[in-house]
Every structure is written in structure tokens, then in C-alpha cells.
């Protein structure tokens, strides 16, 4: 469209043919937009009740999983299998080695150290022959060295 046609259309108005084309096109655009709006609206079903699974800041009802620390008193090396399962399942474990001899204790500590390293956990001595093993989701605060007397 040239400059002279634009000026004449501006002064004289738009010819009827072009006016009706624009109106027709805008009606199609409007009907397309309403279809999109209708498609994005959820269907209403009066028999169903919908509850939000997301908790809001104002109404925070969070359900927390109960955390437990398991206590084990192994007497043989094969008892360590259950300790390892607990750590792999995200549970903290206190292991009391009072029933084991020194060689067995070293084997178990080596095994647990490797397991704790694999799950990015932590292992600390909290007493004579007593160790705390925690997986990644536990945080130990404070200094436990005062419990051991070291």
C-alpha cells in the first residue's frame, strides 16, 4: 500500500470491502481466543470435591515422617547386614560394640565407613565402643568429643 493510498484511506475512510475483511478476520480471531479459553478451563463436575495437595503459606499442614534412630548391639559380623539396610533406607543408627572382640569391631567399622561414604553420611564416635552412623539427610550439631572424654 503506497503513501498516497494510505492518506486517501485516512481522509476518505476505508473502502467497504477492506472493512468487512478486517471485521471477518477479527471475529475469527475472537472465536479462536474463546476456544482456547474454554479449553483451558477445567470441566465442572458438581459431584467431585477437589483438595489441593500443595500447602499454602497461610494454611501449612505439613505431615512429617517420624524419624527414628535405631540402636544395634551386634555380636557377630553378620549382624551388620541389618545395620547397613537401615542406613541405606535413610535411618540413623547407633552401634554398641560391647559384645564384639577387637578384630570384629575393626572389620565392622571398616564396612560401615565404606557404606557411610557411599551414602554421603557421617560416622562419629560417641562413647567407648559406641558409634553414631547417620545418612545424608541427618545433621549432627555440636561436639560429640566431650562425650568420649577425648
UniProtKB/Swiss-Prot annotation:
Gene: sepF
Gene3D superfamilies documented for this protein: SepF-like protein (3.30.110.150)
Biased composition (Polar residues): 26-37, 48-61
Pfam annotation, one family: SepF
Region spans: Disordered: 22-61
Biased composition (Basic and acidic residues): 38-47
Summary of subunit composition and partner proteins: Homodimer. Interacts with FtsZ.
GO cellular component labels: cytoplasm
Protein name from the UniProt record: Cell division protein SepF
Keywords carried by this UniProt record: Cell cycle, Cell division, Cytoplasm, Septation
GO biological process: division septum assembly; FtsZ-dependent cytokinesis
Location in the cell: Cytoplasm
Highest taxon of the lineage: Bacteria
Role of this protein: Cell division protein that is part of the divisome complex and is recruited early to the Z-ring. Probably stimulates Z-ring formation, perhaps through the cross-linking of FtsZ protofilaments. Its function overlaps with FtsA.
Similarity comment text for this entry: Belongs to the SepF family.
